[in-house]
């Protein structure tokens, strides 16, 4: 998961409680943007444990999904698998609220303008495609959070033209593994660099855009230092950082 300031988080994976122990309480979280419903991004079982801390807050936690991703919530509401069928009760008690977002429409969520864009990656629902998020802060700082991404289709690339991003956080799931052409729903180093070239041509990014690589599968990639070296050698003119657990990123234009 990626915490954005005090009260917004992107995704809620199965390691959220370990992260809370290591990096601080999650009780201030008010909004959770879900990219897609694979369980490494939305571990619905965590909802049951989070509901035990309701005495620490008086307002619901709001979860946001793509329209197809929201269908997963509709299934959970009527399933005994989800806490014995008590999810509706949690909603009625004001513990959680679930919302649908449309691709390429902008919403005011917390202190950000949030625009979901269509990724090229599936989810638990048959027609689901990931929602990547363009987030604009009050000071104008603009960031793209791209998990899981794959190679974007033309509709998304067209939307991202001239976005002039300050920050780009991208997956690089398969690291330096050479992917077969049909494996285009995740990125490796080569396909990430291909996407970077497209973003450069389309003025989606600038040379001073801060770029971070995450969602890296340790089973299919070089060690951290080697992957960092690959990126530095390939694009020395860009600020590409291979991320790690606990990394803090300045998200304002004054570097704070």
Spell out what each predicted region is.
Residues 150-247:
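Cap/insert and terminal regions of metallo-dependent hydrolase folds
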Residues 17-19, 45-51, 73-81, 190-200:
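Short, well-ordered amphipathic alpha-helices
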Residues 24, 50-59, 79-91, 137-138, ...:
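Alpha-helix termini
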């Amino acid at each position: 998961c990626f915490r954005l300031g005090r009260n917004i988080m992107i995704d809620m994976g199965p390691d959220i409680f370990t992260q809370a122990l290591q990096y601080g309480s999650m009780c201030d979280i008010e909004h959770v943007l879900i990219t897609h419903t694979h369980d490494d991004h939305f571990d619905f079982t965590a909802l049951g444990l989070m509901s035990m801390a309701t005495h620490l807050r008086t307002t619901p936690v709001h979860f946001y999904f793509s329209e197809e991703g929201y269908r997963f919530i509709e299934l959970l509401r009527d399933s005994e698998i989800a806490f014995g069928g008590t999810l509706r009760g949690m909603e009625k008690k004001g513990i959680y609220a679930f919302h649908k977002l449309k691709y390429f429409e902008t919403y005011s969520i917390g202190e950000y303008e949030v625009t979901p864009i269509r990724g090229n990656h599936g989810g638990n629902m048959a027609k689901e495609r990931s929602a990547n998020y363009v987030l604009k802060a009050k000071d104008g700082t603009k960031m793209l959070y791209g998990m899981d991404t794959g190679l974007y289709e033309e509709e998304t690339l067209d939307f991202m033209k001239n976005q002039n991003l300050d920050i780009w956080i991208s997956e690089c799931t398969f690291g330096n593994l050479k992917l077969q052409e049909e494996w285009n729903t995740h990125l490796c180093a080569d396909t990430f660099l291909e996407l970077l070239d497209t973003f450069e041509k389309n003025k989606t990014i600038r040379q001073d855009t801060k770029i971070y690589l995450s969602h890296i599968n340790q089973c299919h990639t070089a060690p951290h230092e080697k992957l960092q070296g690959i990126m530095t050698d390939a694009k020395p003119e860009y600020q590409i950082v291979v991320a790690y657990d606990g990394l803090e990123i300045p998200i304002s234009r004054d570097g704070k």
